[in-house]
Amino acid sequence: MSKVNKVVLAYSGGLDTSVIVKWLQENYDCEVVTFTADIGQGEEVEPARAKAEKLGVKQIFIEDLREEFARDFVFPMFRANTIYEGEYLLGTSIARPLIAKRLVEIANETGADAISHGATGKGNDQVRFELGAYALKPGIKVIAPWREWDLTSREKLLTYCDTHDIAVEKKKGKSPYSMDANLLHISYEGGILEDPWEEAEEDMWRWSVSPEAAPDQATYLELTYQNGDIVAIDGEALAPHEVIERLNKVGGVNGVGRLDIVENRYVGMKSRGCYETPGGTIMLRAHRAIESITLDKELAHLKDSLMPKYAELIYNGYWWSPERLALQKLIDESQQHVNGVVRVKLYKGNVIVAGRKSEDSLFDDRIATFEDDGGVYNQRDAEGFIKLNALRMRIAADKGRSMK
C-alpha cells in the first residue's frame, strides 16, 4: 500500500462505512475525514457526527445538499427527458457526481491526498464516484475497501466491529433487500429481489401506495415551467428541492412512480432493481407535455435522438465528461422557450396530461383546425411536397428495385 496521510471518506454512519473508518486507520495508518451528505434520503444525518467522533475522527463534514442536488443535477437531467433503457429515471446515478464533487472539494480544503467510498466492486457506484473524482482532481488517490479487504459478508463485518469495539446497530436476521434513498427516489435491490420472477412484496414499498389502494378521486396539479424547469405548483413558487418533495408526496399518495426492472449495469451484469420515483415520474410526463407545444419539431426530434446517449453517460458515471457537458449546453439552449403551464391528473398510478398552455406555444389552431381555416393553410401545397418526398422511391421503382 502506498503511503496515505489523510483520506476523505463518504460516510453514512452505517455498518459498512463505520467499519471502513477503522479499517483505513488500521491498514493505512492515516487520518480519516468523514463527509456525510443530506441529499434528501429522509434520515437524520446529524447522528453520523457522534458515530464518527467515537471512531476518533477529528474533521467531520455534514452538509445539506438537497438544493444543490435538485438545482444543479436533477433539474438539468430532466430538461433532457432522461430515462435509461426506456424506464429507469436514474435516481441513484444522478446523486453520485455531487458526492464525488464534494469529496474532492473537501480533500482540497483539508489537504487530504485520498478519498474513499463504500461502494462494492460489483456495482456501478464505484465507477461513478471514481470517474468523477479523477475528472475533477486527476492526481487524487482512491481507496475502495471492498476491492481490497476480505470482509465479504455482513457476519464478517459484525465480527470486525466486535473485535475493534465499533458500536453499530445489530438488526436480527438478514435484510430481505438493500435500500438506498435520496430526494429523487428510493431503490431496492438484492436479497429476495434477485429472482426476477418473484413479485416484490407490498410492504417493501415505502413512498407510495399501490395503485389499487390509491384514492378513487383524481388529483389535479398545475405545474408552471420557466426555461424547462418547474418553478411553481398550483401557483405557489417553490425552490427545486421543494418541487420534488411536493411531487413525491402527492404522487406517492396516488400510487405513482413504482418501477420493477432488470437493467444492464456498466460493469457487465444484469441486475434487478425496484424503484419508487413519484415526483420524477410526474416531472417527466409534464415536461414532455410542455415541450410538445413549445419546441420546434426538428429540435424536439434531435433531443430525443440524443437522450439515450445522455442517459447512458449519466448511468455510467460520465457526468463530468466533456461529451456530457457539451450535450448539456445543447439541451439547455433548447429550453429557452419551454415556458408555460401543464395540468396533470393523477389517478391510481397514472399521470395523465389534462392540459397545456404557453405564451411561447407553436401550436396554431388556425392551421391545425379541421374546420375552415380561411385560407391560412393551402392544401394544394401538399401535392408538391408529397411528390418531392416520393421522388427517390419512384426512381428506385422505375429501375426495377423491389420494395418488398
From Swiss-Prot:
ATP binds at A10, Y11, S12, G13, G14, L15, D16, T17, S18, A37, G118. Pathway: Amino-acid biosynthesis; L-arginine biosynthesis; L-arginine from L-ornithine and carbamoyl phosphate: step 2/3. It catalyses: L-citrulline + L-aspartate + ATP = 2-(N(omega)-L-arginino)succinate + AMP + diphosphate + H(+). One of its GO terms (cellular component) is cytoplasm. It comes from the Bacteria. SUPFAM superfamilies: Adenine nucleotide alpha hydrolases-like (SSF52402), Argininosuccinate synthetase, C-terminal domain (SSF69864). L-aspartate binds at T120, N124, D125. Its main location: cytoplasm. GO terms for biological process: argininosuccinate metabolic process; L-arginine biosynthetic process; urea cycle. It is found in: Cytoplasm. L-citrulline binds at Y88, S93, N124, R128, S178, S187, E263, Y275. GO terms for molecular function: argininosuccinate synthase activity; ATP binding. It holds the Pfam family Arginosuc_synth. Its EC number is 6.3.4.5. Keywords: Amino-acid biosynthesis, Arginine biosynthesis, ATP-binding, Cytoplasm, Ligase, Nucleotide-binding. InterPro entries: Arginosuc_syn_C, Arginosuc_syn_N, Arginosuc_synth, Arginosuc_synth_CS, Arginosuc_synth_type_1_subfam, AS_cat/multimer_dom_body, Rossmann-like_a/b/a_fold. Homotetramer. PANTHER family: ARGININOSUCCINATE SYNTHASE. Belongs to the argininosuccinate synthase family. Type 1 subfamily. This is Argininosuccinate synthase. It comes from Hahella chejuensis (strain KCTC 2396). The gene is argG.
